[in-house]
A protein has these predicted regions:
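Short N-terminal "domain-start" leader segments
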Residues: 1-15, 55
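Generic short amphipathic/hydrophobic targeting helices enriched at N-termini
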Residues: 4-7, 30, 46-49
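Short linear motifs centered on Gly/Pro in flexible linkers and helix caps
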Residues: 11, 32, 42-45
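A short, exposed loop/beta-hairpin motif centered on an aromatic-Gly-Thr core
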Residues: 19-36
Length: 60
């Protein structure tokens, strides 16, 4: 069985009209393996107007 963790994803967006950076968006996902988190981050990074995606493993 794979270990499951809680990850926090930081997403940097660009406004499509002005080209300016929007405030970062944070998403919290639970019960994900490290590989699942990488796939999710890659999928987010391929979204239009996304500049970067960082993810952190939540520590208790």
């Amino acid at each position: 069985m794979l270990n499951k963790y809680t990850f926090i994803f930081e997403i940097g967006w660009r406004d499509s009209k002005t080209g300016r950076l929007k405030p970062y968006e944070y998403r919290k996902k639970t019960q994900m393996s490290i590989n699942d988190a990488r796939v999710y981050a890659r999928r987010l990074a391929n979204t239009q107007n996304v500049l970067h995606v960082r993810f952190y493993k939540e520590m208790y």
